[in-house]
Amino acid sequence: MAFQGTSRTLTQQSSAASSDDLQKILFSPDAIKKMATECDLGRHHWMRADNAISVRPLVPQVTSNNLLSFFKSGYDAGELRSKGYMSVPQVLCAVTRTVSTDAEGSLKIYLADLGDKELSPIDGQCVTLHNHELPALISFQPTYDCPMELVANRHRCFAVVVERHGYIGYGGTTASVCSNWQAQFSSKNNNYTHAAAGKTLVLPYNRLAEHSKPSAVARLLKSQLNNVSSSRYLLPNVALNQNASGHESEILNESPPIAIGSPSASRNNSFRSQVVNGL
């Protein structure tokens, strides 16, 4: 995957003349080449026995120098509000194994700040993957913006750290790590808030029900149910009750049907309920 990006976050806070300088810093052929060779952006990095620990900064050294000079000059001249921040919304790492599942080993992958001498994981964002768990897709999200500054003669920026453990007897490549991200630079930093994990319930949706017509039996049952709910029953010598409560009580108190041909059938024939609205 080739490096792609825009300079909107920079050009919105700088003049037109400065925009050309920014595009040269970020998107010149040399800058794009450095992003690939020094940072392995969109490239497969092989984890070997002779390369057990890999620290890949998200910004090349030359690009960091140019950005640091650009923001510092703008800040000293009063044109920019700060000396520059680096933000990375997300770092996506695709990890695949290149040995059989029987190999005993693991990879430890995390996001670090080069300003930290110990290279500790940022807010505990660290993943340990055993060989039999690969392949896997990992996502890291920094929780703050990294200032563009020098710390002990080191350019401060985010970095992806991969450590290989185990794999006794395997001197070659045991896993491949392909990382992708899009770094953004601005004179104004962002505010980050903690969000609790949530769950969204997704109900199944029957799309065929919209295009299929109900059967004749289903239509008949539906019409009968509608008529029963709106019908009024009239008993002999009983006035018609227009209230809903009276209607419900009459339905509940209705006598069970009498079998045709029984001795009481003719005697009770005149006492059958008469349906006003009809079924």
Swiss-Prot record:
Biased composition (Polar residues): 267-279
Residue ranges, compositional bias (Low complexity): 256-266
Chain intervals for the UniProt region annotation (Disordered): 256-279
The keyword Transport appears for this protein: yes
Keywords, sorted A to Z: Host cell junction, Transport, Viral movement protein
InterPro entries: MPV
Pfam families associated with the record: 3A
Superkingdom of origin: Viruses
GO CC annotation: host cell plasmodesma
Subcellular location: Host cell junction, Host plasmodesma
BP GO terms, sorted: transport of virus in host, cell to cell
Principal location class: host cell
Similarity section: Belongs to the cucumovirus movement protein family.
Function, in words: Transports viral genome to neighboring plant cells directly through plasmosdesmata, without any budding. The movement protein allows efficient cell to cell propagation, by bypassing the host cell wall barrier. Acts by forming a tubular structure at the host plasmodesmata, enlarging it enough to allow free passage of virion capsids.
Protein name: Movement protein
Organism encoding this protein: Cucumber mosaic virus (strain S)
